[in-house]
UniProtKB/Swiss-Prot annotation:
This protein's UniProt keywords: Ribonucleoprotein, Ribosomal protein, RNA-binding, rRNA-binding
Cross-referenced PROSITE patterns: RIBOSOMAL_L20
Pfam families referenced in this protein's UniProt entry, alphabetically: Ribosomal_L20
Annotated GO CC locations: ribonucleoprotein complex; ribosome
Organism: Enterococcus faecalis (strain ATCC 700802 / V583)
Protein name according to UniProt: Large ribosomal subunit protein bL20
Function: Binds directly to 23S ribosomal RNA and is necessary for the in vitro assembly process of the 50S ribosomal subunit. It is not involved in the protein synthesizing functions of that subunit.
Gene Ontology process terms (BP): ribosomal large subunit assembly; translation
GO molecular function, one term: structural constituent of ribosome
Alphabetized InterPro entries for the sequence: Ribosomal_bL20, RIBOSOMAL_L20_CS, Ribosomal_protein_bL20_C
UniProt similarity note: Belongs to the bacterial ribosomal protein bL20 family.
Keyword RNA-binding included in the entry's annotation: yes
Amino acid sequence: MARVKGGTVTRKRRKKVLKLAKGYYGSKHTLFKSAKEQVMNSYYYAFRDRRQKKRDFRKLWIARINAAARMNGLSYSKLMHGLKLAEIDINRKMLADLAVNDAAAFTALAEQAKDALSK
């Protein structure tokens, strides 16, 4: 049986990894072994952080809503409960946007939440 030389396949595989490692610091973009390890870690970080991003944004929105709610004399949890009782269905992303960009509209929502809580 003849010997199979895998030069082209190996070269293509290595070039593919080194192309993915373009822009990495130090030997991580030139040496195949360290580039391969870094690319694998990069995929791991990307996968993990796509999920982390959702948590981070939710935390940011809640912090913004809480700050604006306290300026209107409510805590975050009281505001959310009041909005639910008033049957105002608005998500946290939109509430946070209102809190930052349209304080008057947020204040109106906070007043409706207060009214619903007092009933």
